[in-house]
Amino acid sequence: MPEAKPHAEPCERNKGPILEVLRQHFAGRRRVLEIGSGTGQHAVHFAGALPGLIWQTSDLEPNLAGIRLWIDEARLPNLKPPVVLDVFGPWPDAQFDGVFTANTLHIMSWTGVRALFAALPAILEEGGVLVAYGPFKYDGAFTSASNAAFDGWLKRRSAHSGIRDFETVDALAQSSGLTLLEDRPMPANNRALIWGMRGS
């Protein structure tokens, strides 16, 4: 029997709304780096729907085999095999005009979030766009009871995880040369945060 591909039901539910965001903000882009491709479901869906984009997948080493299963089945010419990417380095020796990451900032440690944003000036071209999807707090408050419960679950699983404060993340983004372009409400109490890389 062929090896079963990894599958996450939330990816199936949110891929449509996220694609609407990407169609707008990645219009005219050429090369996108996905940080934390996870199961690979998002990459296949977005690369298939956006054939003008070269979509580079990445994740930690243990997740690469599952991503390859999705990519090998899809056979999309614009979807690239995953590269190992740990936010603490090394990063790909390449530049991109789009970066996408979904449901990663609340999983990695805050030190990891800082490392991710610190690396962006070398990775994201001037005028490039970062799209980050996931739940966030505002003014220190959760946007829903379900997000508060999810945050508690995250912290029980790993003390370093947790839903991040939008204001703190945006300040971090600004310190890396990014300007907030849009904060879009998404289904299931998530957000799509879009930043643009300022010129030097």
Model regions: which residues?
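Class I SAM-dependent methyltransferase Rossmann-like catalytic core
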Residues: 1-29
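Class I SAM-dependent methyltransferase SAM/SAH-binding core
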Residues: 33, 41-89
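A short, conserved alpha-helix within the catalytic core of class I
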Residues: 108-120
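Conserved beta-strand signature within the Rossmann-like core of class I S-adenosyl-L-methionine
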Residues: 127-136
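Conserved class I S-adenosyl-L-methionine
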Residues: 28-38
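Core SAM-dependent methyltransferase catalytic element
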Residues: 178-200
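Conserved Class I S-adenosyl-L-methionine
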Residues: 143-167
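A short acidic, Gly/Pro-enriched loop at the edge of an enzyme's catalytic core
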Residues: 91-99
